[in-house]
Amino acid sequence: MSAANPETPNSTISREASTQSSSAAASQGYVLPEGKIMPNTVFVGGIDVRMDETEIRSFFARYGSVKEVKIITDRTGVSKGYGFVSFFNDVDVQKIVESQINFHGKKLKLGPAIRKQNLCAYHVQPRPLVFNHPPPPQFQNVWTNPNTETYMQPPTTMNPITQYVQAYPTYPNSPVQVITGYQLPVYNYQMPPQWPVGEQRSYVVPPAYSAVNYHCNEVDPGAEVVPNECSVHEATPPSGNGPQKKSVDRSIQTVVSCLFNPENRLRNTVVTQDDYFKDKRVHHFRRSRAMLKSV
């Protein structure tokens, strides 16, 4: 006893319609794509840009009650030249496809409407835009020296080629270490606090003494001094601006006349620095008698 699976009338009609549509499409010179044939729907190609859905609906109304007319357009709304016409009731799609239809003097390309299978929808997830912000300014303390602080600042964006790094010392009385830019040698500038803030800057140089030997003999007042060997230390004038500034040209041999009192005259003795300045305050130098002929 064999069991037979009876076929429904709808499946038989659908298979026959598909076969007829395939043969009709092959007779018109094009091959149908693989997919599911949409019932009661006709593919219409060769649509002129001047045609609208209302005209197409009124034209295909002769074949049955038109359900929908869809003209495919691009993103700008311009027709791509083809569309679909669907009917409410069962219509003879094969009869419509085999008919030669000219609309506005242009032959329409008709065929069964086929929905393609295995359609892959490609969804691309948009990537978020990431903006690289410049790093925030960094302030670091160098503990190698308790009075030394390091200040770092990122380069400004005003000029993309040249980068400037500026240091901001907050303590003017403390040494400041300046770091200049990226991948550059580090220069340490040590500024010792020699004066408080707001005070006039002055440089104090300790006086230096050089030994000068003079030859002096006993002379009467008013006579020229004959040099005799004696050791006198001459003070070098300070480099700062003072009320009394004297310069000594060491390239010229200078002999200083010494006029001593008879009570304090010394013979062939060494005159110390204190005695020299004491005698200098007592006796006045006279340039007319002080300059001697150099030997």
Swiss-Prot record:
Modified residues (Phosphotyrosine): Y276
GO MF annotation list: identical protein binding; mRNA 3'-UTR binding; translation activator activity
InterPro entries attached to this UniProt entry: DAZ_dom, DAZ_RRM_vert, Nucleotide-bd_a/b_plait_sf, RBD_domain_sf, RRM_dom
Biased amino acid composition, Polar residues: 1-10
GO annotations of cellular component type: cytoplasm; nucleus; protein-containing complex; ribosome
Low complexity bias: start-end ranges: 11-25
Keyword match Nucleus: yes
UniProt subcellular location: Cytoplasm; Nucleus
Cross-referenced PROSITE patterns: DAZ, RRM
Region of interest (Homodimerization), residue spans: 80-132
SMART domains recorded: RRM (SM00360)
Keyword RNA-binding attributed: yes
UniProt region (Disordered), positions on chain: 1-25
Keywords for the protein's UniProt record, in alphabetical order: Cytoplasm, Developmental protein, Differentiation, Nucleus, Phosphoprotein, RNA-binding, Spermatogenesis, Translation regulation
Domain RRM: 40-115
CDD domains the record matches: RRM_DAZL
Organ and tissue specificity: Testis specific.
Gene Ontology terms describing biological process: 3'-UTR-mediated mRNA stabilization; female meiosis II; oocyte maturation; positive regulation of meiotic nuclear division; positive regulation of translational initiation; spermatogenesis
Ranges of residues in domain DAZ: 167-190
Its job: RNA-binding protein, which is essential for gametogenesis in both males and females. Plays a central role during spermatogenesis. Acts by binding to the 3'-UTR of mRNA, specifically recognizing GUU triplets, and thereby regulating the translation of key transcripts.
Family classification: Belongs to the RRM DAZ family.
Subunit structure: Homodimer and heterodimer. Forms a heterodimer with DAZ. Interacts with BOLL, DAZAP1 and DAZAP2. Interacts with PUM2 Multiple DAZL RRMs can bind to a single RNA containing multiple GUU triplets.
Protein name, as recorded: Deleted in azoospermia-like
UniProt lineage: Eukaryota, Metazoa, Chordata, Craniata, Vertebrata
Gene name of this polypeptide: DAZL
